[in-house]
Amino acid sequence: GLGSLLGKAFKIGLKTVGKMMGGAPREQ
């Protein structure tokens, strides 16, 4: 559903931000 799509996009966004910030350690 829409919720799962948003959740997936959010996780991808966090990964992208982490790479941009210099590879911050994962949380969750």
Swiss-Prot record:
Disulfide bonds: none annotated. One of its GO terms (cellular component) is extracellular region. Its main location: secreted. Expressed by the skin glands. GO terms for biological process: defense response to bacterium; defense response to fungus; killing of cells of another organism. It is found in: Secreted. The keyword Repressor does not apply. Keywords: Antibiotic, Antimicrobial, Cytolysis, Fungicide, Hemolysis, Secreted. The keyword Cell wall biogenesis/degradation does not apply. Peptide CPF-B1: Has antimicrobial activity against Gram-negative bacteria E.coli ATCC 25922 (MIC=5 uM) and multidrug-resistant A.baumannii (MIC=4-8 uM), against Gram-positive bacteria S.aureus ATCC 25923 (MIC=5 uM) and methicillin-resistant S.aureus and against fungus C.albicans ATCC 90028 (MIC=25 uM). Has some hemolytic activity against human erythrocytes at high concentrations. Belongs to the gastrin/cholecystokinin family. This is Caerulein precursor fragment B1. It comes from Xenopus borealis.
